[in-house]
Amino acid sequence: MHKFILILLLILSVSVKSQNADDPFEGKTLCIIRNKKIDTLTYLKQFEINKANYIGKPLAYLLNNMTQIQPKTIWSLPNFKSRRFVYSSQFRFVSKENSLRQNNIFLLIDWQDPIPMSEAKYYKNKNHFIFTDEERSYYGTKIIKDIIVHR
């Protein structure tokens, strides 16, 4: 009887594995939210397509409309002409440890008014690129000039 149960379990586990091979999300960057897979690139591209709804508004408005996923890290990008200001920030949706891997998807926000590098560095040094509630509050008041999604 025990042998029969073991053989049955083995057969069931093989059939479960073969069903996973037909995953429609294979090869795409995914985030699992409450046991539900979402296609991160497709989801974020919708914000880029509808950027007219967000340009000229504070970042908090965009973040409040992101109901399925939120940024986990922020990377401030200096302008090569003036390293005293941040003109763009990258928001990534994976952990800090995974954010430098190839093919990560990020949301690039160009700011209407440049952010002093000293302020961006303060948060970077304090939170080590992690997008905290404190940064959400700080950057949330900054006005969006443009939105671009990259992979």
PLM segments and residue spans:
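Bacterial Sec-dependent N-terminal signal peptides
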Residues: 1-24
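Residues within mature, well-folded domains
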Residues: 20-151
